[in-house]
């Protein structure tokens, strides 16, 4: 028998790698990781241990089944005894029914005593016979009432006394036999829903609420205490539905395990991780022969991208994750859906903090790691130093006696890229990656954003099943029918199988990045699942917001001079919100607390300024700009709005402001805004925009931001400014003219051009 790795033996024994490694340690077999190899003697020793364990479990299961058979026999005996006693009691009841008493009063007493006997019977017997006994009682009672009225016509006093006695017994019987209705409701419910639940008209319910001093319309939500109080006025009991902490997989049971015979081979999903600027996107550029890095601000990947390539007629899916520590959550999501992790380390820089973090993410996900040592073409490259630092962090190279695959590469020259791809396919083949394509799809949302023209969009990675055009899906509280799907090259596709990244359209709102996405049978099922999650999230938000406000209030009282820095975040994509949030909250210290009071996708609007004014907050925009109305309102309300294109600048500014070191050298002055009415292509010059100046002025030496739906598209200097055929230094409000942007031609009618200058401020 040849040597095999730990994780391969775990698959053969049908146990988890973690469990196998613990058993190896118990048997004094030393292994470093799941990639370690075992010899023939060690394999035989482990297999014999698990065979003994299986025999013990089998004997225990047999003994348990014998005990259960005995219990079933005893239960059957008890049921037979209960049936016999039930027959006897029925006979006794029938004999009582045939007996006609001489005096009505005695008959009343027997009816009541008969009810008391039934009341104290076993609960199971009560449930079977309650309706029959009630009918008998009512029948006996009516006969008694008739006899009372006929026998006592000549005696008025006797009649009154006996009728009063009868009424008391009638009320007692009704009180004991009639139980109030019970309903289960959510912790919060609208007045309309409550009226339908307890079968009371809306007008009656609103009137009763007004009597209790509560003014509410039919669409207004009331809490459980209020609902319980008003329901009690209608002799109805309501109970609160317990909202449990749940995971999508546990509650919906949609991500079930497939049968082995249904599984088919699927492409591997590769996550590229590493420290910022170590060359992750550049390596993907070389592999895909595209220029993604050139389009990112500062050459840094801002959002997760998913790409499919072909190598030797086999597909490989790459996830490109940002390297900065602000994107911890995004990298963690990438590790959860990946099969092989590529750790990029610069040969001239070595292991950095985010490199260690990426190692931990990959180890926690239990995926094999391939180290790509990049930038080996540089003069100060030191591969041996990188190997030493990797070994110190638990990744021992193969040529040093370890099990970590190291591939020296150069993204600039292309050296070693083919070797890296071969190693990826080799490791993926050892993993035996399979999935069932013939089932409803299950996947993960990699990124999501709101597009003005197409609505909510989501980049997803299908993990199981096949996602098809027109499928009903839900992800978190978002749901809808897929109207269109696009692959990573922008081409429309009709279906996507396992390990396929696609951009989908058709959801009713933007899902959360990292959420699972499920395909279901019909629209009703998708809406129900999404609504259930929405209700759960709303309850959690109500709880957290009320608790947070109280903590904030008491915190200020106890801390005395504690200051809070409230921040509102607006970004162009949803995944960036969490990244900025985590980074800014970490900046809190003993003197200043950073509170993120709101975060959303889209441009900065007047509602954001109103919220900032009410909560004394500053607004931070990332790749977005405020509307003109929002800018004017912020100026009047003295609200600070800061916009950024690179996340590090935002973090550094807030950090410096907290520590009191922020001394701005330049202050931005917005000169004016112009709207693009038409565009013209001029040979040798490029695209020239015909603009109309709405506010302020546009000058020749100004820097211009091109905004499309308040999203920042381009920022750069003005290349030309004309009025008719003449070059001018400025265009003022109410005038039209032509404007060209330096090295940028993708201008469209309806775009807004915002001109500004930076004025030096004395320190």
UniProtKB/Swiss-Prot annotation:
Residues 52-178 are annotated as: Disordered. Residues 374-377 are annotated as: G4. Residues 146-161 have a biased composition (Low complexity). Residues 65-82, 105-116, 123-135, 162-178 have a biased composition (Basic and acidic residues). Residues 299-303 are annotated as: G2. Residues 410-412 are annotated as: G5. Residues 265-434 form the tr-type G domain. SUPFAM superfamilies: Initiation factor IF2/eIF5b, domain 3, P-loop containing nucleoside triphosphate hydrolases, Translation proteins. GO terms for cellular component: cytosol. GO terms for molecular function: GTP binding; GTPase activity; translation initiation factor activity. Keywords: Cytoplasm, GTP-binding, Initiation factor, Nucleotide-binding, Protein biosynthesis. GTP binds at residues 274-281, 320-324, 374-377. Residues 274-281 are annotated as: G1. It is found in: Cytoplasm. It comes from the Bacteria. Residues 320-323 are annotated as: G3. Residues 136-145 have a biased composition (Basic residues). Pfam families: EF-G_D2, GTP_EFTU, IF-2, IF2_N. Residues 86-96 have a biased composition (Polar residues). One of the essential components for the initiation of protein synthesis. Protects formylmethionyl-tRNA from spontaneous hydrolysis and promotes its binding to the 30S ribosomal subunits. Also involved in the hydrolysis of GTP during the formation of the 70S ribosomal complex. Belongs to the TRAFAC class translation factor GTPase superfamily. Classic translation factor GTPase family. IF-2 subfamily. This is Translation initiation factor IF-2. It comes from Finegoldia magna (strain ATCC 29328 / DSM 20472 / WAL 2508) (Peptostreptococcus magnus).
């Amino acid at each position: 028998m040849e040597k095999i790795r730990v994780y391969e033996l775990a698959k053969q024994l049908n146990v988890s790698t973690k469990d196998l490694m613990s058993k190896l340690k118990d048997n004094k077999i030393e292994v470093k990781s799941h990639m370690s190899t075992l010899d023939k003697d060690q394999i035989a020793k482990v297999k014999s241990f698990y065979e003994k364990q299986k025999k013990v479990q089998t004997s225990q299961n047999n003994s348990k089944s014998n005990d259960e058979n005995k219990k079933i026999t005893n239960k059957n005996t008890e049921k037979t005894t209960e049936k016999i006693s039930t027959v006897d009691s029925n006979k006794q009841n029938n004999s009582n029914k045939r007996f006609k008493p001489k005096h009505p009063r005695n008959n009343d007493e027997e009816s009541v005593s008969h009810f008391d006997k039934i009341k104290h019977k076993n609960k199971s017997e009560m449930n079977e016979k309650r309706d029959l006994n009630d009918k008998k009682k009512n029948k006996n009672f009516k006969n008694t009432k008739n006899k009372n009225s006929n026998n006592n016509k000549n005696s008025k006093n006797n009649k009154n006394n006996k009728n009063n006695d009868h009424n008391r017994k009638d009320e007692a019987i009704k009180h004991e036999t009639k139980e109030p209705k019970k309903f289960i409701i959510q912790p919060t419910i609208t007045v309309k829903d409550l009226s339908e639940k307890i079968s009371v008209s809306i007008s009656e319910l609103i009137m009763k609420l007004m009597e209790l001093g509560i003014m509410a319309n039919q669409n207004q939500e009331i809490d459980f205490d209020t609902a319980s109080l008003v329901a009690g006025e209608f002799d109805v009991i309501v109970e609160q539905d317990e909202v449990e902490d749940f995971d999508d997989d546990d509650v919906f049971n949609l991500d079930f395990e497939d049968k082995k015979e249904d599984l088919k081979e699927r492409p591997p999903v590769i996550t590229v991780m590493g420290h910022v600027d170590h060359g992750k996107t550049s390596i993907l550029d070389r592999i895909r022969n595209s220029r993604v890095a050139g389009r990112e601000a500062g050459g840094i990947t801002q959002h997760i991208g998913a790409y499919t390539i072909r190598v030797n007629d086999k597909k490989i899916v790459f996830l490109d994750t940002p390297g900065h520590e602000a994107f911890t959550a995004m990298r963690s999501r990438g590790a959860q859906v990946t099969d092989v992790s590529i750790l990029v380390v610069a040969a001239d820089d070595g292991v950095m903090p985010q490199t260690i973090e990426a190692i931990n993410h990959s180890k926690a996900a239990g995926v094999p790691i391939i180290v790509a040592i990049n930038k080996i073409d540089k003069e100060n490259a030191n591969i041996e130093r990188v190997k030493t630092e990797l070994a110190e962090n638990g990744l021992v190279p193969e040529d040093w006696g370890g099990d970590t695959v190291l591939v020296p590469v150069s993204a600039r020259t292309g050296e070693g890229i083919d070797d890296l791809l071969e190693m990826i396919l080799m490791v993926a083949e050892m993993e035996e990656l399979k999935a069932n394509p013939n089932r409803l799809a299950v996947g993960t949302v990699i990124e999501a954003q709101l597009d003005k023209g197409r609505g909510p969009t989501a980049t997803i990675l299908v993990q199981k099943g096949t996602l098809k055009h027109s499928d009903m899906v839900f992800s978190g509280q978002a749901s809808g029918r897929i109207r269109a799907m696009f692959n990573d090259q922008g081409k429309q596709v009709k279906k996507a199988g396992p390990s396929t990244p696609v951009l989908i359209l058709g959801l009713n709102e933007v899902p959360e990045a990292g959420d699972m996405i499920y395909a279901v049978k019909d629209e009703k099922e998708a809406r129900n699942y999404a609504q259930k999650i929405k209700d759960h999230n709303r309850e959690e938000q109500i709880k957290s917001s009320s608790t947070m406000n109280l903590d904030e209030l008491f915190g200020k009282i106890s801390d005395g001079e504690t200051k809070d820095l409230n921040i509102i975040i607006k970004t162009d994509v949803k995944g960036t919100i969490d990244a900025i949030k985590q980074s800014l909250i970490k900046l809190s210290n003993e003197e200043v607390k950073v509170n993120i009071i709101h975060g959303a996708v889209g441009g900065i609007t007047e509602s954001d300024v109103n919220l900032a004014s009410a909560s004394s907050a500053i607004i931070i925009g990332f790749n977005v700009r405020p509307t003109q109305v929002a800018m004017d309102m912020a100026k009047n309300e003295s609200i600070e709005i800061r916009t950024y294109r690179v996340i590090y600048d935002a973090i550094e500014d807030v950090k410096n402001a907290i520590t009191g070191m922020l001394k701005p050298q330049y202050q931005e002055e917005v000169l004016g805004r112009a709207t693009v009415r038409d565009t013209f292509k001029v040979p040798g010059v490029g695209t020239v925009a015909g603009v109309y100046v709405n506010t302020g002025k546009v000058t020749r030496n100004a820097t211009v931001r091109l905004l499309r739906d308040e999203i920042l598209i381009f920022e750069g200097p003005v290349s030309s400014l004309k009025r008719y055929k003449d070059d001018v230094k400025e265009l003022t409000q109410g005038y039209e003219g032509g404007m060209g942007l330096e090295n940028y031609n993708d201008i469209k009618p309806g775009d807004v051009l915002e001109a500004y200058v930076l004025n030096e401020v004395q320190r």
